[in-house]
Amino acid sequence: YHAFLEGDVEARPNLEVICGAHVTRVVLDGDPGELRATGVEYRTADGETAVAWADKEVVLSAGAVGSPQILMLSGIGPRSELEAVGVDCRLDAPDVGKHLKDHLQVGLLYPAPGIGVSMGQMGLSMGPDALRAPAGPLPADPADDADLPEALGALKTEAERRVTEWATTGHGLVSSSLYEACAWFSTGLGDDHTHDAQLGFFICGYNEDIWRGCLRVDPSEYFDDPEERLAPDAESVIVLANPVQPHSEGEIVLTSADPLDHPDIRMNYYGDPYDMEVMVAVLRRALDVVANWPAPRQLGPLLVPPALAAEHGYAPGDTPSDDLLVDMARHYSFTVYHLTSTCRMGSVVDERLRVLGVDGLRVADASVMPNVTSGNTNAVAIMIGEKAAEMLAEDHGVALAEVVASPA
């Protein structure tokens, strides 16, 4: 919003942003072989159905789950799957929703007194609002701060100081992404000319909300002493192991013709055994990096869930076996939210992001990537949007604004 819409852009007369709307389908005119997108049907926040008509083109940008879902709800997709849920197939496009790719990661958690950042320090650095009830010790209503006990008053003052430090100097813990270091390398299992692995260094552990809400893991199953490990002053670090060129492919499949029903997201993680082989190699490299950490800043022993440690005879300080690493990957891998390739270029869209077989319809998001990138997808997704805008301008004879270089 801040980068692309805020200010003059959102005030333009040719831009209307409709909040709370849910696109239900692309409106198609014509017979097979002569299909054209003429608008999008959507439901408003009030539940009313409306149509936004297109003078020139419709551009979908709903992501690697949403874009193929909208295409299929519009009748563009694998014929047998559409007919199975009662959607009239307007264009048999077998690859819509297929070839789903994503990055997986496994976090290796290490106690790191004096090195890692505690969750308490993280909360303090995010300012007073992050410390308010119900989750924090400060009152929910700032008006009640006048009667704070001395200790809580000092806590609030320090939180304000840290936010001010960041706002005025750009320094301080709040300026950190927490993902403080990264490494890319080749495991040697794939193409030697490209990297297939990534390591990340996360300078704090996870709190209980992240364990339960994001990772879907019960901390009492991962730790012998969850209260100690998740205490606000516990200092930990996480080394994230990411294979970045997975071979396994999943798919997006409609569960019904109702646009408000979530599609079936079949990730098929580790469906190709090669991906597990690479994950073990990446974990092994991560362990090697930690084992060779500079002496004054050594991390504690790797924390392994008690049940897996007992099953594999692992004791703190041991070198984990490959079988243990496989089990850790199977039980504790989690998504990096890098879903791509479900409307991929070459089989669903052409080199200018136009949907094959339909005039006036493009897709511009991570779903058009032929394969997932060998690293984070955020910058690539932004680039796709920028390039799509450029292509639209070129194809419709709209002059592009000159790029003004910033002064050196």
Named regions from a protein language model:
Residues 357-373:
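Short FAD-binding loop at a beta-strand-to-alpha-helix junction that anchors the flavin cofactor
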